[in-house]
Amino acid sequence: MLSFLDREHTVAKPGFSRWMVPPAALFIDLCIGHAYAFSVFNLPLTKLIGVTASAPQDWTLAEVGWIFSFAMLFLGSASAVFGKWVERAGPRKAMVAATCCFAGGFFVSALGVVTHQLWLIYLGYGVLGGCGLGIGYISHVSTLIKWFPDHPGLATGMAICGFGGGAMIGSPLSVLLMNYFASVDSVGVAQAFVALGIIYGLFMTIGAI
């Protein structure tokens, strides 16, 4: 049923233009680049209970500040650990795995916000999201380099450009969603996480397939 994800089914057919690859990679980059926009959640996460101001039961900025660091740690770790698997599995299967991890990380984080369990946010955004970042980044970068062996700098440049662009889009989008879902008894973080998981899951799936 999922055999179309296998490496042998990702061989380009005659007439395929390699310039179709960068837009697909850009879809991925603009999503996973959201990791660099996580700081917009730091302050709202310290007011989940107090809403307008931090309550004694709320988390401190120091407690939530390490979530981004965890994501970066697992980005590097996943890249190193799963690098050979990505080459064996092929870009399509690797990107689907990255999508499941990255989007799933938002859903787990939303559960952590609703239940006020900080470790779930570390698990969701930090571990799962970080692994999705790592797998997603190396899979499309290696694919771009293979398609553009005559322009390796251009290939990696396109990837890095999209990665940075993801933060530029992700930051205002996250703020917009939190403001939209905010109410007198909620800062809107949980709902924003769910919405982002759906949005990024959809766009990453399009880019992967």
Predicted regions: what they are:
Residues 1-32:
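Cytosolic juxtamembrane N-terminal segment immediately preceding the first transmembrane helix
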Residues 30, 105, 118-135:
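Hydrophobic core of transmembrane alpha-helices in multi-pass small-molecule transporters
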Residues 42, 82, 166-182:
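Small-residue (Gly/Pro/Ala) motifs that create kinks and tight helix-helix packing interfaces
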Residues 45, 133-156:
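Intracellular juxtamembrane helix-capping segments at the cytosolic ends
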Residues 66-84:
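Central cavity-lining transmembrane alpha-helices of secondary-active solute carriers
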Residues 100-115:
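C-terminal ends and interior cores of transmembrane alpha-helices
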Residues 149-172:
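Glycine-rich segments within core transmembrane alpha-helices of 12-TM secondary carriers
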Residues 190-209:
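Symmetry-related core transmembrane helices of the 12-TM Major Facilitator Superfamily/SLC fold
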